[in-house]
């Protein structure tokens, strides 16, 4: 199901003042945004659609505001007057604590975190001088119980003690902050996080739940930022896959297992592949909670896995959910050679989806659906079902 598409325009003060241009289409009515995205998708996939062969289902949408579950805040200003937000096009430090994309409880917590930085006396990192400590605050919200994962990205270990001293007061005020960690990123470059993660709480993962499937978020594991539409994306994948009644299933670029765990049953042999070990750990915990025994998750490169000896047993159906770069020609060739009944391709970049479709041989599109996980931007997710000729 989709939310009713209202032909209204959201009013954002940040955008109107020229302080933030991230939602570049926020002044375009939602119905018009969806029409433009749908047209772009149809044009990109037109070369791969035989007449009357593929069905383009109506776009799936959610709320236009208060939908986002993750905030990535640059920490600016000074220790006595910190600012959580971005640097505007004019070079101004702009607080984004009241961004319309965040739920109201998240906005409130972001304001409290600004106060926390000030009270703890943590100096924000100054890019122009390569001095200071606190680079980013990353906040992730679970819709299950409104719990949070909070990360402080620091240049060094020097301010950890300041955070630890101030943390008990914050956690007493906000017991819904379930996980707190410090990430050390010492490099003077525009890199969001470093290799070292230090947990300041006993809990190390945040629970989320889509369609009664338990999923877990750790600091470095990828997770969809629009829970409402993501739940519909996973449910649609489950329904499309069930039509083929596969006995074996691969979930490549599986992340925390969202697609594979939605599609798996106790009778389906599921193999999930993901390069990030933290995500694989989360996926395995979910599988155990669901009582799935014919499941294996491995921290490997998906292309390397498909070309290696572990891929000897060919599955009935393959799911791919790659990053924006797509799956690449080598993996396209491997999928063509495996010749499963069907390939379910979830793409966050329709341009690379179209490029990959040029290299997947022996398949035709039967279903395509757009999921608008990123309102007011040019980005969207696509679910495409390819069936063996």
Swiss-Prot record:
It comes from the Bacteria. Belongs to the class I-like SAM-binding methyltransferase superfamily. RNA M5U methyltransferase family. RlmC subfamily. GO terms for molecular function: 4 iron, 4 sulfur cluster binding; iron ion binding; rRNA (uridine-C5-)-methyltransferase activity. It comes from Shewanella putrefaciens (strain CN-32 / ATCC BAA-453). PROSITE patterns: SAM_MT_RNA_M5U (PS51687), TRMA_1 (PS01230), TRMA_2 (PS01231). [4Fe-4S] cluster binds at residues 12, 20, 23, 99. This is 23S rRNA (uracil(747)-C(5))-methyltransferase RlmC. S-adenosyl-L-methionine binds at residues 224, 253, 274, 321. InterPro entries: 23SrRNA_MeTrfase_RlmC (IPR011825), MeTrfase_TrmA_AS (IPR030390), MeTrfase_TrmA_CS (IPR030391), SAM-dependent_MTases_sf (IPR029063), U5_MeTrfase_fam (IPR010280). The gene is rlmC. Catalyzes the formation of 5-methyl-uridine at position 747 (m5U747) in 23S rRNA. Its EC number is 2.1.1.189. It is an enzyme of class 2 (transferase). GO terms for biological process: rRNA base methylation. The active site is at residue 348. It catalyses: uridine(747) in 23S rRNA + S-adenosyl-L-methionine = 5-methyluridine(747) in 23S rRNA + S-adenosyl-L-homocysteine + H(+). Keywords: 4Fe-4S, Iron, Iron-sulfur, Metal-binding, Methyltransferase, rRNA processing, S-adenosyl-L-methionine, Transferase.
């Amino acid at each position: 199901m989709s939310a009713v598409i209202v032909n209204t325009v959201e009013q954002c003060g940040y955008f109107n003042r020229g302080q933030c241009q991230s939602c570049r289409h926020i002044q375009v009515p939602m119905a018009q945004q969806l029409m433009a995205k749908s047209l772009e998708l149809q044009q990109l996939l037109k070369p791969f659609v035989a007449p009357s062969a593929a069905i383009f289902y109506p776009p799936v949408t959610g709320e236009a505001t208060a939908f986002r579950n993750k905030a990535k805040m640059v920490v600016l200003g000074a220790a006595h007057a910190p600012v959580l937000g971005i640097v505007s096009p004019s070079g101004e430090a702009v607080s984004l604590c009241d961004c319309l994309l965040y739920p109201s409880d998240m906005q409130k917590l972001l304001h409290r975190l600004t106060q926390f930085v000030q009270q703890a006396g943590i100096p924000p990192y100054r890019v122009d001088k390569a001095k200071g400590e606190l680079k980013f605050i990353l906040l992730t919200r679970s819709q299950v119980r409104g719990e949070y994962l909070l990360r402080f990205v620091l240049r060094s270990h020097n301010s950890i003690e300041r955070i630890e001293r101030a943390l008990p007061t914050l956690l007493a005020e906000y017991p819904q902050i379930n996980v707190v960690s410090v990430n050390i990123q010492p490099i003077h470059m525009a890199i969001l996080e470093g290799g070292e993660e230090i947990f300041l709480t006993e809990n190390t993962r945040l629970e989320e739940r889509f369609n009664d499937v338990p999923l877990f978020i750790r600091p470095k594991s990828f997770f969809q930022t629009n829970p409402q539409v993501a739940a519909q994306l996973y449910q649609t994948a489950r329904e499309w896959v069930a039509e083929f009644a596969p006995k074996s299933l691969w979930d490549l670029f599986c992340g925390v297992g969202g697609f594979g765990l939605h599609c798996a049953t106790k009778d389906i042999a599921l193999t999930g592949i993901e390069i990030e070990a933290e995500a694989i750990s989360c996926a395995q915990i979910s599988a155990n909670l669901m009582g799935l025994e014919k499941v294996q998750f491995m921290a490997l490169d998906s292309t390397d896995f498909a070309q290696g000896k572990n891929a000897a047993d060919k599955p009935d159906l393959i799911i791919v959910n790659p990053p924006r770069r797509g799956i690449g020609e080598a993996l396209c060739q491997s999928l063509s050679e495996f010749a499963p009944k069907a390939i379910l391709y979830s793409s966050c970049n329709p341009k690379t989806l179209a490029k990959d479709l040029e290299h997947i041989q022996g398949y035709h599109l039967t279903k395509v659906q757009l999921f608008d996980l990123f309102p007011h931007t040019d980005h969207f997710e696509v679910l495409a079902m390819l069936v063996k000729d």
